[in-house]
Amino acid sequence: MNMIQNILRVVFGSKFERDLKKLIPIVRQINSLEESIKGMDDSTLSSQTKKFKERIVQGESLDSILPEAFATVREVSLRTMGMRHFDVQMMGGIALHGGNISEMKTGEGKTLTSTLAVYLNSLAGNGVHVVTVNDYLAKRDANWMKPIYDFLGISVGVIQHDMDHEQRKVAYAADITYGTNNEFGFDYLRDNMVSHKDHKVQRSHFFAIVDEVDSILIDEARTPLIISGPSDEATDKYVRVNKIIPKLSEGEDFEVDEKARNVLLTEKGVSHVEEILSIENLYAPENVDLVHHVHQALKAHKIFRVDKDYVVQQGQVVIIDEFTGRPMEGRRYSDGLHQAIEAKENVTIAKESQTLASITFQNYFRMYDKLAGMTGTADTEAEEFKKIYNLDVIVIPPNVSVQRKDSPDRVYRTEKEKFQAILTEIRELQSKKQPVLVGTISIEKSEVLSKMLASAGIQHNVLNAKFHQKEAEIVANAGKPGAVTIATNMAGRGTDIVLGGAQLYKENLETWKDEDEIVKQFKESILRQNLEYAESLMQKMDSGTKQKRASEILSSVKIWKKNHEEVLAAGGLHILGTERHEARRIDNQLRGRSGRQGDPGSSRFYLSLQDDLMRIFGSDRISGLMKWANMPEGQEIESKMVSNAIARAQKRVEGHNFDIRKHLLEYDDVMNRQRIVIYKMRNEVLENEDISPLISGFIEETVENQIVTHCEGNNPSAWNLESLKEWSDGLDLNLQIDEVEFKKSKNPQLSLFEKVSSTAKLKYESKAEKIGKDIWKLLERNIFLDILDHRWKEHLYSMDHLREGIWTVGYSERNPLVEYKLQGFRMFDTAIENLKNEIVNFIFRVEVSENSKLPEEKKEYKKVGQEITGGFQEFSGGNLNRSQSNGSSVTVTTSSGGGTERKTSRRRKR
């Protein structure tokens, strides 16, 4: 394969070269328009939007408008924000418009780049979604780029987690909507639970640009979005099962599989559990739940670790995002795992929940007509992006070549030796005033390192889930001379670390609103770092207040500039990785925090043979290295075998995780096809005021099923007319059937069908006439939606249980996925048939009277109570009560949140 790739590269050039060849001519075309666009006054420039839209209405494509639109955005950005798009940013924008992933290094201006494709696609009038990883970035990016869009007459909306229905509707009605992946996904699910089409908030899924696309479409791909309702199960069973875990022995009663993040009971363990719980057969049908709880309790004790996977704060178990180190407050593991951890930590145990609606990010984002993404690290996952999302990765060259020096890894035998070497390097770096960002993979490790630094008298900041409130401040100061910052993984991602520390004077400039021409010139000279001219302008200001403010800004700039030059002289920001992550991409993200926009920088990883990656995924040959004799303590291991083993281990884990994500998608595709059918049916009801043709079709199908069941064939003497009559009486059809009458017919069964159908149709029409057409139409729709939601909820519950138990068919050498598809299809077929029967039964049995009033529409949209993301649940907000067809009330619940590669496997139990 490598030889073929090499031949293709020689003949056609590398993919990178081929991509550039396509982009460069378009960039030249854009640049050729720059002078003519510059010559436009503000009024003419802002009217470009109207002209573009008119051309689109006349049939012109977005592709043909692209050069002019991009040149327009570039000029507007320069006039409103003082930022001109570089040519490489133009390339990134073209790639985004083409429905690709633009890989742009940290500091290359991805947010500004996105404005090009966002503006162009907003002209189509179908709405553009810009997807970010958290609420803060959604709001920041929208407000930051808003001057460009405002100038061009393009509206901007922002979705935030705490918004109500009306606020969301307004945000989605805008030309451009910023929000998180979770909010977009949950709004889609909620839209498919509303009782009236006007209650929907989202429009079409036309075009989405996903920022940090690797984080959302790869890291969180195993995180199903789930809207759930409370279950009636008691919580005392968790306490009961939790007590038996300390009595079980690892190796004898159970085995821990760290690679798969799983625990398996041995035969001896099964017997031991049966003995402790005083039961005869743990795997008897009545003990299915018990097996599940024992399994989850074992995982809680043996796989999930406090201060690594979660923290306990104020009597609650709070999940830690594996990829960012951030706390995921309000979110919960699903399938009883969170309750098992609560029992382990001896805190209040919350009730389990039942799924009401769900979708994976994979299937949600594949609904968009066009999808694009941005990140600094996508190329290592190019195969997955192509196979799952049909997205090509286009690597955009940096505007200024990267000056960062990446040094080889230093590997030690033990973790203790590694940390000692790290301490020595940090001390050396701080002595020469070089700022250092220390990346760790867990809170536990960050706190161990923090204690060592404190003992050595080294001042430092820690950024992890326990101190996340100070994140912005800590990240802002991480570039100061001699600053030492410990951060778990990619905490602070999305915010650049500026060499010299935070440029506080910029905030002061932005908030200084003054139309005085001298003040304007002063602000411009500060941004251009022309401090001498700025000082002369300060002297010309016409008031002491203005001069005082200008003086404060100048002082702030001078302090930052001195710090900036000191850091540059020291070598820029140094990245010190304390452990390799399972994915090379995460390591690259950490390295990418240094060397932005041509700044100097450096990076090095310190590893030990006791690190999780080496211990769990390294080959047996590596473990032999730990027995090396005659090596003095603290000496680093320099071996190609170690370096190659690290690379192989990472590739092995990446492949393993890709297989899991692909496996999840294969299972979710079964549910997705069913979800599409249900939501299509639901939308048909919402979009049509009169659904009587749909109901009439259900009535005919129900009648046909009854006749096929009770009156098979054309021999009336063999028919079970008594059962048919019993069914018809239940619907109050008043059906009169004479066997003799049908014996005279050429096709007795068809004649019977026609008679029963016409009787049912007359009964149906008389009910509608009696109550009044308008009331009847609304009543029908309400009945249909309530029964549909109820049946769908029950079907999801059944599919959950099918998924949990389907692994057992593997023992009989059958493929669990094939079996899941077959059984899932049969169950769905039955659910649809039951749905139709129940709707028909309810329609005929519903009591109506002449003075019936029109049912009140549910006007209010409330943020629903419980959300689950990626196997996580979230409790927040109020309740949305929906009456069910059986008269009971269900409290619907909803979601938001992110997830991690391993924590999200909510289905994969065994």
UniProtKB/Swiss-Prot annotation:
Residue segments, region Disordered: 873-910
Alphabetical UniProt keywords: ATP-binding, Cell inner membrane, Cell membrane, Cytoplasm, Membrane, Nucleotide-binding, Protein transport, Translocase, Translocation, Transport
Catalytic activity line of the entry: ATP + H2O + cellular proteinSide 1 = ADP + phosphate + cellular proteinSide 2
Pfam families cross-referenced by the UniProt entry: P-loop_SecA, SecA_DEAD, SecA_PP_bind, SecA_SW
SUPFAM superfamilies: Helical scaffold and wing domains of SecA, P-loop containing nucleoside triphosphate hydrolases, Pre-protein crosslinking domain of SecA
CDD domains hit by this protein: DEXDc_SecA (cd17928), SF2_C_secA (cd18803)
Compartments where located: Cell inner membrane; Cytoplasm
Residues holding ATP: Q89, G107, E108, G109, K110, T111, D496
Statement: the UniProt record of this protein carries the keyword Translocase: yes
Keyword Transcription appears in the UniProt entry: no
One Gene Ontology term from the biological process aspect of the record: protein targeting
GO CC list: cell envelope Sec protein transport complex; cytosol; plasma membrane
Biased composition (Polar residues): 876-886
Gene Ontology molecular function terms on file: ATP binding; protein-exporting ATPase activity
Membrane topology: Peripheral membrane protein
EC number(s) recorded for this UniProt protein: 7.4.2.8
Domain of life: Bacteria
Family from the record: Belongs to the SecA family.
Oligomeric form and interacting partners: Monomer and homodimer. Part of the essential Sec protein translocation apparatus which comprises SecA, SecYEG and auxiliary proteins SecDF. Other proteins may also be involved.
Function: Part of the Sec protein translocase complex. Interacts with the SecYEG preprotein conducting channel. Has a central role in coupling the hydrolysis of ATP to the transfer of proteins into and across the cell membrane, serving as an ATP-driven molecular motor driving the stepwise translocation of polypeptide chains across the membrane.
Protein name: Protein translocase subunit SecA
